Amino acid sequence: MRECISIHVGQAGVQIGNACWELYCLEHGIQPDGQMPSDKTIGGGDDSFNTFFSETGAGKHVPRAVFVDLEPTVVDEVRTGTYRQLFHPEQLITGKEDAASNYARGHYTIGKEIVDLVLDRIRKLADLCTGLQGFLIFHSFGGGTGSGFASLLMERLSVDYSKKSKLEFAIYPAPQVSTAVVEPYNSILTTHTTLEHSDCAFMVDNEAIYDICRRNLDIERPTYTNLNRLIGQIVSSITASLRFDGALNVDLTEFQTNLVPYPRIHFPLATYAPVISAEKAYHEQLSVAEITNACFEPANQMVKCDPRHGKYMACCMLYRGDVVPKDVNAAIATIKTKRTIQFVDWCPTGFKVGINYQPPTVVPGGDLAKVQRAVCMLSNTTAIAEAWARLVHKFDLMYAKWAFVHWYVGEGMEEGEFSEAREDLAALEKDCEEVGVDSVEAEAEEGEAY
C-alpha cells in the first residue's frame, strides 16, 4: 500500500482537516463512527481508501491523521463534534497555551515542549503503514502555531523520514483580509525554514477563496466553514487519485516529478472548476471543455496572482467524474492554441492529466452543487512571484521600523534570522523571474514578431 499521513497544525490546519475528513467519509461511505457498511473485508484489505484510513479488527476505519494545536479550543471542537468517534483520542494533540500569533513561540519556546509527543504519535501511525508514501501537512503561514510549529515539525520529519515526500497545503495570508498584524513576519520566517524541507506546497489564499464564494456561490458574507468546504473539495480532488482507482492515476511523487522543475520552485497554483451553486448548475451544461477553460481564468485561482503576467512551467489537470480522454485531449488542444496562455520555451509539452471516474461528492446542505464532472488544475507558474513580492513588501514596511521584533527576540530568536529569511525570499522571487526568461535565441525572434 502507498499510505499517506495527514498532519493538521494550528487552527487553520485543524479546521481544514475537519472539512477534508468530513468529505472523505462521505466519498467513501464511512459513517461518523468509522464503520463502513460497503466494505466487506474486515481489517486491512487492499482497497484504495486504505491509503488514508487504517482498519481495526472490529471493522472501524480510522483516519491516518494527527491534529495538533498549541491551545485546546479548536481541537476540543473535534473532540466533541460529529466525528468524535472517528478519531483515536491520541490523534488529537493539544498544548496548554497558544503561540499567540508568534512564530518564535511556535518554533522555539512552546513548540519544543510538544514536538516529541507529536513525533511519537506520527511514529505510531507510520508503524501501521506497510509502505508509507509521505506526509500531507496542513497549516497557515500567518498564525504562530501554523508557521512556527509546522516548520519545526517539518525539520524534524526530514531527520526521521528523510526519503518520504512532504507536501504542504498552506493558507497564504490574504492581501486584504488579515487575521494578525504580524502575518508577514510569520509567513516569511516559515517559508524560509520549510523551503528545503517541503517537496511541494499548494498555497491557498483566503481572499481568493472569499471572492470565489461571493462571486460563484452568491454567498454575501462567507464564513470559514464556507471557505474550508471549498478548500476541502480541492484537497479531495488532489488526493482522489490516491484514494480511488482511476484510469490515469497520479501518485504523490508523480506530482513532484511533473510540477517541480527546480527544487526551490515548488509552489503550484491550484484552480478548481466548476464552483457553482445548485440553482445555477441546474441551467448550465458543464462540458469538459468548459470546465477546462474555467481553470485558466485567474478568477478561479486559489491564490491572487495573474498567470497572464507569468509563464507556465508545468500543468497537471486532475479530472474526476464522467470524463473521457478524448474530450480532455480536445479541450487541452484548444487551450494550447490560445495566445494568452504562455509556456516557458524549455517546457513545450507541459500538461499531465489524471482521470478518476469517481464523481465529486458534495457535503449535504453545503453551498456547492452536485455536478457530474469537475477538474482541479495544479499549475506551476512564474506569476507566483507576485505573491512573494507582496509579502516581502509588507515585511519590509514593518521591519524598517523594527516593529514587533521584540516579541520574537524575547522568545529566543536572533535578529539575524529576520534578514536571512527576507534574503531567502527575495532570492526565491528572483528565481521565479529568471526561470521565466526565455533562452537567448527566443528573445531575438520575439523582437521581430512584434
From Swiss-Prot:
GTP binds at residues 11, 71, 140, 144-145, 179, 206, 228. Tubulin is the major constituent of microtubules, a cylinder consisting of laterally associated linear protofilaments composed of alpha- and beta-tubulin heterodimers. Microtubules grow by the addition of GTP-tubulin dimers to the microtubule end, where a stabilizing cap forms. Below the cap, tubulin dimers are in GDP-bound state, owing to GTPase activity of alpha-tubulin. GO terms for molecular function: GTP binding; hydrolase activity; metal ion binding; structural constituent of cytoskeleton. Keywords: Acetylation, Cytoplasm, Cytoskeleton, GTP-binding, Hydrolase, Magnesium, Metal-binding, Methylation, Microtubule, Nitration, Nucleotide-binding, Phosphoprotein. It comes from the Eukaryota. It is found in: Cytoplasm, Cytoskeleton. InterPro entries: Alpha_tubulin (IPR002452), Tub_FtsZ_C (IPR008280), Tubulin (IPR000217), Tubulin/FtsZ-like_C (IPR037103), Tubulin/FtsZ_2-layer-sand-dom (IPR018316), Tubulin/FtsZ_GTPase_sf (IPR036525), Tubulin_C (IPR023123), Tubulin_CS (IPR017975). The gene is TUBA3E. Dimer of alpha and beta chains. A typical microtubule is a hollow water-filled tube with an outer diameter of 25 nm and an inner diameter of 15 nM. Alpha-beta heterodimers associate head-to-tail to form protofilaments running lengthwise along the microtubule wall with the beta-tubulin subunit facing the microtubule plus end conferring a structural polarity. Microtubules usually have 13 protofilaments but different protofilament numbers can be found in some organisms and specialized cells. The modification 3'-nitrotyrosine is found at residues 282, 450. It comes from Homo sapiens (Human). Transmembrane segments: none annotated. GO terms for biological process: microtubule cytoskeleton organization; mitotic cell cycle. This is Tubulin alpha-3E chain. The MREC motif may be critical for tubulin autoregulation. Its cofactor is Mg(2+). The modification N6-acetyllysine is found at residue 40. Its main location: cytoplasm. The modification Phosphoserine is found at residue 439. Mg(2+) binds at residue 71.
